[in-house]
């Protein structure tokens, strides 16, 4: 079942340690088949160096029940499922504890747009969610994490297709894309942007967002209706 999607998710998960986004098993990638409403995700707690395509777990988008697989799905599965349910255009999701993006999440700070590297991928500020409540933490924590992410985008009027990443307060980053590989790509860029911004704001604590015209130019030439740019 979903052999090609399993292969894509497996390879995307292997890309996380390759790009230094994870320590031990601190990360996961998933992808969705929208026609079948099925999600393929990394198994829980399996080391990357022994993981195989057959270890990937298939779960139902709406119930979270295992449809295929002999291992437990990632503990973050309910978060992934909530994002797929609420953000209908995304096809792949990545969660990591990559160092610099997690620093921003632990500080509870947004990553503002200050340079063209950011503008090439994110059409504005990368938001950090609010702190979760005691009730949310003690309840269905992973599902509530997804709901807090969705709430952040809705309450701030952010389009998830334009800002394909978020920082969960005191936790870490999630990134997404059109498929698993694209989601990993965005997670790599998020980590790089977090690193750049950390030092930029140390050098200039009064740093303000980049010019709107420059942000428009860099984002729209790559993602707009008349996109033309590629390196």
From Swiss-Prot:
Q: Keyword Isomerase: yes or no?
A: yes
The active site annotation covers 120, 229
Cofactor(s) required, per the database record = Zn(2+)
Q: Which Gene3D superfamilies match?
A: Class II aldolase/adducin N-terminal domain
Q: What class of enzyme is it?
A: isomerase
User: InterPro entries, from UniProt?
Assistant: Aldolase_class_II_sugar_metab, Aldolase_II/adducin_N, Aldolase_II/adducin_N_sf, AraD
Tell me one GO biological process term. L-arabinose catabolic process
Reactions this protein catalyses: L-ribulose 5-phosphate = D-xylulose 5-phosphate
Q: Which UniProt keywords apply?
A: Carbohydrate metabolism, Isomerase, Metal-binding, Zinc
Q: What does this protein do?
A: Catalyzes the interconversion of L-ribulose 5-phosphate (LRu5P) and D-xylulose 5-phosphate (D-Xu5P) via a retroaldol/aldol mechanism (carbon-carbon bond cleavage analogous to a class II aldolase reaction). May be involved in the utilization of 2,3-diketo-L-gulonate.
Do you know which NCBIfam families this protein is assigned to? araD, PRK08193.1, PRK12347.1, PRK12348.1
Q: Which family does it belong to?
A: Belongs to the aldolase class II family. AraD/FucA subfamily.
Know the name of this protein?
L-ribulose-5-phosphate 4-epimerase SgbE
